[in-house]
């Protein structure tokens, strides 16, 4: 349990957060094949992390094809999330981008039983959210105020409360099928 992020540091010292792994996610799979890590991971709160040797994963995938299929599904889901994040940063305005971020987080946490559909714990600071969304912390603060004033979403004491799920979903243009399309 706990909160972490994957990120890439830029030459000027700034950071772009790429993702927030949640319990059950497998991180760093690409580095098994590429044999190089092109980004880093950091715990944001106390977190439990279970390391697995890459050679062990490859061996298990050979011996247990269903595990290989599950890892392929997880990798495909992660790729779909990166596509959504690229669209967020490239084409959605700050309000839509922030709404999408919280909709995706709510959906992901709900899928693993860590959230109700409209309420979840979120210890992320506005600085961390800003690094994930390609915004400044000041801009994130303004957008969160807009969401609160529109009675769509509030954050209090590390808890996110979504007040109007349908309106927030519509604002975000959120279609969460890419997160849970496994049958």
Residue ranges: model-predicted function:
Residues 1-7, 22-24:
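Glycine- and acidic-residue-biased ligand/ion/polar-headgroup-sensing regions
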Residues 4-16:
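A short beta-strand-loop-beta hairpin characteristic of the jelly-roll/cupin
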Residues 12-14, 35, 57-58, 169:
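Short, surface-exposed beta-strand-loop junctions and turns on beta-sheet-rich folds
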Residues 19, 42, 50, 96, ...:
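Residues that recognize and position ribonucleotide moieties
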Residues 19-84:
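Cyclic-nucleotide recognition modules
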Residues 45, 65-134:
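Polybasic "coupling" helices that flank or enter modular domains
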Residues 107-183:
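Phosphate-/nucleic-acid-contacting segments
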């Amino acid at each position: 349990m706990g909160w972490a992020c994957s990120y890439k540091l830029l030459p000027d010292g700034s950071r772009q957060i790429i993702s927030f792994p949640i319990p059950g996610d497998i991180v760093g799979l690409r580095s098994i094949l590429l044999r190089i890590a092109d980004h880093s991971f950091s715990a944001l709160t106390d977190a439990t992390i279970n390391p697995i040797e890459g050679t062990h994963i490859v061996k298990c995938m050979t011996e247990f094809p269903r595990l290989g299929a599950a890892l392929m599904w997880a990798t495909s889901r992660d790729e779909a999330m990166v596509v959504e994040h690229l669209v967020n940063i490239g084409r959605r305005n700050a309000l839509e981008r922030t709404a999408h971020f919280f909709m995706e987080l709510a959906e992901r946490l709900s899928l693993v039983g860590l959230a109700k559909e409209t309420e979840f714990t979120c210890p992320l600071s506005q600085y961390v959210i800003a690094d994930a969304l390609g915004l400044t912390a000041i801009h994130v603060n303004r957008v969160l105020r807009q969401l609160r004033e529109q009675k769509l979403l509030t954050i209090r004491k590390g808890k996110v409360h979504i007040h109007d799920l349908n309106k927030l979903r519509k604002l975000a243009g959120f279609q969460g099928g890419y997160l849970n399309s496994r049958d």
